[in-house]
């Protein structure tokens, strides 16, 4: 059977559900698919189908990330049901990176809880651009004033983590009512209202091809009589023959010119996001470029050594360390295509970091790397991964 062609008629956006355990993230995800299925915008998925991650059945905790897709009149969405449990913060640090926006689910009966706060903080740290709120289980609260109090509390919490708490749309409803097909005024109608706010409030992400050119260097060759060729996969933007590019990271920034782009042994006049290409550089010597640097549009990215990271440290069971680490720990940081040694300083009042913890770390690399906020990395010791992280803030 031929594969269905993916109709790319609508703009695409990646979103997810976040929030405290048992506040209704997975039920809401099911409710969205069921509601949109009525207009042909989704395949209805039951709670059990979304929650079907093998580890999770024993403890009722979603561990693995479930993926569903659906569309509204305006956009096509890929939706991840993010794990709510504190242990699974790692999905946010490593994977929920794929979120252009998120739906924060808060139970009206409980109000914000510790993981609500933690997920908002993580969304801020890992750079989720926008949040909308679904206040769930409103049928469990009789008092209108209580609902208003919870709403105020949620808005204040969002503001305290630098999200625009006053402006964020909050939809109040019951995901379960929508799933069970009852009380449309708090069920189905509210799901449609929520999706309208997601459509309107979560900005359309810029397409990789429209961003400034960047290509991590994987390999370097010299071709006699032609010069130096660097190969890699273009991460974003477009590089055209004749354009100036910069080589950033590890050593002082160098400027050069792209004199040729080659893909599958064919010469092209440009390479764009997603292409595996060889880029010919004018007047650059083989020894001037190395793996771990990036080619980029001049001025679009700068080299840095000091940054604040949000990191998750793997447990022993996940193949990580068996023991905690302390301040001045010196692992390797794997950025894009290379390892760089860095020194970790723990925050004041933090004695040590245990396997399974997530924490804010101050890092100083021994050589500069082309860096920007939201850049992901692995923490490694002797080639094995012991942690995952994201650049939350560049210091210098």
From Swiss-Prot:
Pfam families: GTP_EFTU (PF00009), GTP_EFTU_D2 (PF03144), GTP_EFTU_D3 (PF03143). GO terms for cellular component: cytosol. Its main location: cytoplasm. Residues 19-26 are annotated as: G1. Residues 174-176 are annotated as: G5. GO terms for molecular function: GTP binding; GTPase activity; guanosine tetraphosphate binding; translation elongation factor activity. Its EC number is 3.6.5.3. PROSITE patterns: G_TR_1, G_TR_2. GTP binds at residues 19-26, 81-85, 136-139. Mg(2+) binds at residue 26. It is found in: Cytoplasm. InterPro entries: EF-Tu_GTP-bd, EF-Tu_GTPase, EFTu-like_2, EFTU_2, G_TR_CS, P-loop_NTPase, Small_GTP-bd, T_Tr_GTP-bd_dom. The keyword GTP-binding applies. Residues 81-84 are annotated as: G3. It catalyses: GTP + H2O = GDP + phosphate + H(+). Keywords: Cytoplasm, Elongation factor, GTP-binding, Hydrolase, Magnesium, Metal-binding, Nucleotide-binding, Protein biosynthesis. It comes from the Bacteria. It is an enzyme of class 3 (hydrolase). GTP hydrolase that promotes the GTP-dependent binding of aminoacyl-tRNA to the A-site of ribosomes during protein biosynthesis. Belongs to the TRAFAC class translation factor GTPase superfamily. Classic translation factor GTPase family. EF-Tu/EF-1A subfamily. This is Elongation factor Tu. It comes from Caulobacter vibrioides (strain ATCC 19089 / CIP 103742 / CB 15). The gene is tufA.
């Amino acid at each position: 059977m031929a594969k269905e062609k993916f109709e790319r008629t609508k703009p695409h956006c990646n979103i997810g559900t976040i929030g405290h355990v048992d506040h209704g993230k997975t039920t809401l995800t099911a409710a969205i698919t069921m509601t949109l299925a009525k207009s042909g915008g989704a395949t209805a998925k039951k709670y059990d189908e979304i929650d079907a991650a093998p580890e999770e059945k024993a403890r009722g905790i979603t561990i693995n990330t479930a993926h569903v897709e659906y569309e509204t009149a305006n956009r096509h969405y890929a939706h991840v049901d993010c794990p709510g449990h504190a242990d699974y913060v790692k999905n946010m640090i490593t994977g929920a990176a794929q979120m252009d926006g998120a739906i924060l689910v808060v139970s009206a009966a409980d109000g914000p809880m510790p993981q609500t706060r933690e997920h908002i903080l993580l969304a801020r740290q890992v750079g989720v651009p926008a949040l909308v709120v679904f206040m769930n289980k409103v049928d469990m609260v009789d008092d209108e004033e209580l609902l208003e109090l919870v709403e105020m509390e949620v808005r204040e919490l969002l503001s305290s983590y630098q999200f625009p708490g006053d402006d964020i749309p909050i939809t109040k409803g019951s995901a379960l009512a929508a799933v069970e097909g009852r009380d449309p005024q708090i069920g189905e109608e509210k799901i449609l209202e929520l999706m309208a706010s997601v459509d309107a409030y979560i900005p359309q992400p810029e397409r990789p091809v429209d961003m400034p050119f960047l290509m991590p260097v994987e390999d370097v060759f010299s071709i006699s009589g032609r010069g130096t060729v660097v190969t890699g996969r273009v991460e974003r933007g477009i590089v055209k023959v004749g354009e100036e590019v910069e080589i950033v990271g590890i050593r002082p920034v160098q400027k050069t010119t792209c004199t040729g782009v080659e893909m599958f042994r064919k010469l092209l006049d440009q390479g764009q996001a997603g292409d595996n290409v060889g880029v010919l550089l004018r007047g650059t010597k083989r020894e001037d470029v190395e793996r771990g640097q990036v080619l980029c549009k001049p001025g679009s990215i700068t080299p840095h050594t000091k940054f604040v990271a949000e990191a998750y440290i793997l447990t022993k069971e996940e193949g990580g360390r068996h023991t905690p680490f302390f301040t001045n720990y010196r692992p390797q940081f794997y950025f894009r295509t290379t390892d760089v040694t860095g020194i970790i300083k723990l925050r004041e009042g933090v004695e040590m970091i245990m396997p399974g913890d997530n924490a804010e770390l101050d890092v100083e690399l021994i050589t500069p790397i082309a860096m920007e906020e939201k850049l992901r990395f692995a923490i490694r010791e002797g080639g094995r991964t012991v942690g995952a992280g994201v650049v939350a803030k560049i210091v210098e």
